[in-house]
């Protein structure tokens, strides 16, 4: 009778070891990833502490592009634009096949926001690359329209924003686009008067 329990116990332990080897390690990493995200942002943490925590999370999910992208979006939502930009740069370097128009546009936006809302050549290049991959990328079109407005190129800004408005499904995005279009129309009208 005891021998049967030993065999059962050994087979159970062996099965658990095989499961962990085949599937458990990834599940364990996912749990740690989610746990780290919950503990990641303490209000009084320094930028360096946050950066180190992000690096450890990225290392934990180095073979999973979805987790890295989720992390970048999480950081963006927390207004941690410099950290989100850094995470997206890691994403584009390590997962080039998964780098689509939205990743490029989000990278451009995080760089713009972390650069005191000033455009530079890198940001403009990311916007153009995003639009080459997807000419209807709403985020890239909004940024392009904003840049065109700053350059006083109001007609092109209105074109960019009207395309963005057409493809946007998000009510908040549409309000932002409408505000930009309204400003561009006022500026264009004042130039024509």
Which residues does each predicted region cover?
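Register position in tetratricopeptide repeats
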Residues: 77, 113, 150, 183-187
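Structural signature of tandem alpha-helical TPR/SEL1-like repeats
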Residues: 45-58, 80-87, 115-126, 153-160
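Terminal, low-structured helical/coil segments at or just beyond the last alpha-helical repeat
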Residues: 7, 11-15, 159, 163-193
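Alpha-helical adaptor scaffolds
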Residues: 39, 73-77, 83-133
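Structural register within alpha-helical repeat arrays
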Residues: 70-71, 107-109, 144, 181
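Canonical positions in the second alpha-helix
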Residues: 56-57, 91, 129-130, 163-164
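Residue-level recognition of tetratricopeptide repeat
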Residues: 64, 98-100, 137, 171
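Long, contiguous interaction/recruitment modules in multidomain scaffold/adaptor proteins
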Residues: 1-52, 56-60
């Amino acid at each position: 009778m005891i021998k049967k329990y030993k065999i059962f116990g050994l087979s159970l332990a062996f099965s658990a070891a095989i499961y962990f080897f085949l599937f458990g390690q990834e599940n364990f990493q996912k749990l740690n990833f989610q746990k780290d995200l919950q503990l990641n942002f303490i209000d009084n943490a320094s930028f360096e502490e946050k950066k180190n925590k992000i690096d450890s999370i990225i290392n934990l999910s180095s073979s999973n592009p979805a987790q890295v992208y989720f992390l970048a979006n999480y950081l963006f939502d927390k207004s941690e634009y410099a950290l989100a930009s850094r995470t997206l740069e890691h994403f584009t370097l390590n997962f080039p096949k998964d780098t689509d128009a939205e990743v490029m546009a989000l990278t451009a936006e995080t760089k713009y926001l972390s650069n005191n809302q000033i455009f530079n050549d890198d940001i403009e290049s990311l916007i153009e690359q995003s639009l080459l991959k997807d000419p209807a990328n709403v985020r890239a079109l909004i940024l392009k329209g904003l840049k065109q407005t700053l350059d006083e190129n109001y007609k092109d800004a209105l074109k960019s924003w009207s395309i963005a408005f057409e493809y946007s499904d998000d009510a908040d995005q549409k309000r932002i686009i409408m505000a930009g279009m309204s400003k561009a129309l006022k500026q264009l009208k004042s130039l024509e008067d």
